[in-house]
């Protein structure tokens, strides 16, 4: 004869209160990291956000494999879904590394390994090669010069820049191609080193994204396709 034992309501409420408090802290931290985890706000939060994104792939893959092992010969529906989720996660992880390596070969920028990065804008000024992550290839690119401070798409990239230091073109690299943006117009005040330059799409191909001082992309700048 078995007897049913009920859990006291007070104990249930106590456990729920503890779990609720813990999850409240975890979700609040996660919310702050996701909302303000941008490199222009805080490098610490940005690094924490990237660590979370990088850890999600192996964590989800491990959980899917464990679920498949636990569901084998027990629940075939759960087993099938676990195998499917493991395959999807593995494919996404492999695609991330392949696209990141392809983007790295074009830019040699560590932004290539940012899971949020789809494209990288590259510009050379004062002998420096500057890369900025962007979500996609824009129709046009604007460089703004304010009292010698160069802003690319609103981000400060260099100081002490003169009007004649502005490049003739900029590039946007994607995993599959590199888009060259030619300068088509500018308005400058040489005395105050203030003005702007506008670039539009000129051509695309298998080019190295690092711009050179000339205004023409030569064949020697082409790179081999990935094998």
UniProtKB/Swiss-Prot annotation:
Subcellular location per UniProt equals: Virion membrane; Host Golgi apparatus membrane
Entry function:
Component of the viral envelope that plays a central role in virus morphogenesis and assembly via its interactions with other viral proteins.
State the name under which the record lists this protein: Membrane protein
Membrane topology of the entry: Multi-pass membrane protein
The gene is M
- Name the Gene Ontology molecular function terms of this record: structural constituent of virion
Lineage: superkingdom: Viruses
Instruction: Tell me the keywords, alphabetical order.
Output: Glycoprotein, Host Golgi apparatus, Host membrane, Membrane, Transmembrane, Transmembrane helix, Viral envelope protein, Viral matrix protein, Virion
Primary location group: virion
Example GO CC term: the record gives: virion membrane
Q: Note on file?
A: Bat coronavirus 512/2005 is highly similar to porcine epidemic diarrhea virus (PEDV).
List the source organism: Bat coronavirus 512/2005
Residues that span the membrane, as ranges: 13-33, 43-63, 77-97
């Amino acid at each position: 004869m078995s007897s049913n034992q009920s859990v006291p309501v007070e104990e249930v409420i106590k456990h729920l209160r503890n779990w609720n408090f813990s999850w409240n802290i975890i979700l609040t931290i996660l919310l702050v990291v996701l909302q303000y985890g941008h490199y222009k706000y805080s490098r610490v939060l940005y690094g924490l956000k990237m660590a979370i994104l990088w850890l999600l792939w192996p964590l989800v893959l491990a959980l899917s494999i464990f679920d498949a092992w636990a569901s084998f010969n027990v629940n075939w529906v759960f087993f099938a879904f676990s195998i499917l989720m493991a395959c999807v996660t593995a494919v996404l992880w492999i695609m991330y590394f392949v696209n990141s390596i392809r983007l790295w070969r074009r830019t040699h920028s560590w932004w290539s390994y940012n899971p949020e990065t789809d494209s990288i804008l590259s510009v050379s000024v004062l002998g420096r090669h500057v890369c900025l992550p962007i979500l996609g290839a824009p129709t046009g690119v604007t460089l703004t010069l304010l009292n010698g401070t160069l802003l690319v798409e609103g981000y400060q990239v260099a100081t002490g820049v003169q009007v004649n230091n502005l490049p003739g073109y900029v590039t946007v690299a994607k995993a599959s191609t590199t888009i060259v943006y030619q300068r088509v117009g500018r308005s400058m005040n040489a005395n105050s080193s203030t003005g702007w330059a506008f670039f539009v799409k000129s051509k695309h191909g298998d080019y190295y994204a690092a711009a050179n001082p000339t205004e023409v992309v030569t064949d020697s700048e082409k790179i081999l396709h990935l094998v």
